[in-house]
């Protein structure tokens, strides 16, 4: 019987596996952001777990979500094109079941396995038979297909078909493989899970050895001992991270019900490892600066989290290595004018010492807020420090270095003390030619700095003094509400209104109308939370943002957009 898989299908599978490998590599490069999904209890038949697992949502769900997004951007015909193409290439596939890809390394080399939801794979292959190089059905029902000079083996296992480059790989797939990947496709259109500890230790060690060898050769060629020490410390941390890492997960999904594009990531370390201790030491704490979290914010960033002893130690090593590199750079002939290098280094060392003293307090607490709108831009921030008095002393010392120039900023220290915070004022004349800046800030830009025993504040913009005092007052009212470790939110509408008030634009006006009709006014949100031995990060892009992109794209035949 001559049944085979088309070359296009073989190439498609190969390209998909390559894309998955690239995604896993990119995810590994951003380990600090991590992902939430728990590892499935399901294993392969040899008791191991796949090194890499990919779950793709059902074709029906994928088509519905693509239709939703293309409708948001005002191009529903694109969703129709996708649906037609998907139907042409997925005939015979169960449209309501997810697709899975597993990569095992039981043999010491990657073995990709594709799992397709179909009850009759022979029917699918028969339709594509003419595009195969060769095909043979073996006595046990396995179908061997010649594709681009290699053989792919396909087996029917219940309601799914399994394809791999060896029969041994097919034997690794359990009778019901769906639990291996279904959780990844349940909440996302695409889910990826990387089990780092399933990579054989010799392969991990070989990778680390090659990385260290390449580093050594690069440093020998560079000849900068300061940079070498810094890079060596960073390399040690990367090596520790790779050895301690357990699981990475990535999920990309379209949530039509919530009206958002969702990206979830998570990272976990091996229980009992140094990295796990660092992750476990990060827990939400009461915050002095939580008032930045407000509904009318154009943007805010907030973090309030404990810092583990292991993280403090690692931070100290990093600061020391960077200071050594800076000292070496400033000591080079001609780096700075005579005497200036020592002075600059003195200030840098003071800042580094203050930063480390703050970290050694075992917590990080900060908040940043931007308010914007028509002819309006304000900013306020607060930051925990170990000694606000040292910050004030450093600022006063630096102020003596400001040149005697009428265009230079004017500083007024010890303006007043408000609720335990000493306020200082900075004024800067806005040149007459800067019409847009004067429209926002007036003839003089005013900024305020506040220093307290354990905090530093800053604000600028019209009305920034009142905004700063309001922010200071709010710090005493935090009731220790449990919040995420860190969170960020950006809302498009206030920035669009600001841009349009500075210089009116038809395209911006059109986007404003579109975003104004959306529920979230164009929000982008990020939340970071702790999980056992790790952390998870969720990004949400609201429907208003997607609609804004569509509104900014010129309609075919209408000409290019003004920007």
Regions flagged by a language model, labelled:
Residues 144-218, 441-519:
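A conserved glycine-rich beta-strand in the N-terminal activation segment of trypsin-fold
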Residues 88-96, 108, 118-157, 193, ...:
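Short Gly/Thr-rich strand-loop-strand
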Residues 39-148, 183-247, 266-375, 399-413, ...:
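Structural boundary/hinge residues at secondary-structure and domain interfaces
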Residues 100, 349-374, 388-389, 405-412, ...:
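Long compositionally biased, domain-poor regions of proteins
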Residues 16-34:
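Bacterial N-terminal signal peptides
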Residues 50-54, 99, 112-116, 143, ...:
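One face of beta-strands
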Residues 1-15:
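N-terminal secretory signal peptides that target proteins for export/translocation
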Residues 25, 480-481, 485-563:
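In a subset of proteins, long, contiguous C-terminal domains/tails are tracked
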